[in-house]
C-alpha cells in the first residue's frame, strides 16, 4: 500500500528528541517562510508516531520546514507517517542532514554520536539477524556512509565532551578542529582528577 501524505495539525508535531542540527532564524529561514506563505509546503515532512500517544508525531525529516510553517502561521502541514523505531529514526535524521553543504563541527559531532549510539543499540537487539546489522563497528559504518575515515568520526565524537562555550568557539572557528579534539582529552582528564579531590573534601 502506497504511503500518501496526511495533513497533521502543527500542535501534534514535535522535533526529534536529541536532534543534532541547529534550526537557525536567518535569511534562508525568512526565504523559506515567504515561500510557504505563498505556495504552502511543497515537500511533505517525514514523521513517526510518538510513543505512548494516540495522535502525536515526532519529526524525522523537515525540522526547518516545520519551524518555518510555525512562523508563517500555518495550522496544518503535509507529512508522510513512517513506522520507525527510535534507532531507525535517529539514523534517518542523521542521514537526511549530513549531505547539507554547510554543517557546523558541533552538528557533525552530535550527529555522529547519535547515529553511533543507534547503531550500537541495534547491534544489541535480539530481533535483528546478523544480516540486518553488519558485524562492523558503528564508527566504521558511519565512516563508509559519509565517505570519511573511522578516526575522523571518532575525533568528531570527541568534541561532544567539550562544554558549550568552547564548542561554540569551535563552530565560530576561533578554535581549530585538532586543538579542540586535544582539548576534549584534557578536560576529561581534569574532571577525573578533580572528582576524587572534591569527594575527599566532602568527606572531611
Feature roles, as predicted:
Residues 191-204:
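Single conserved hydrophobic/aromatic residue that forms the stacking wall/gate
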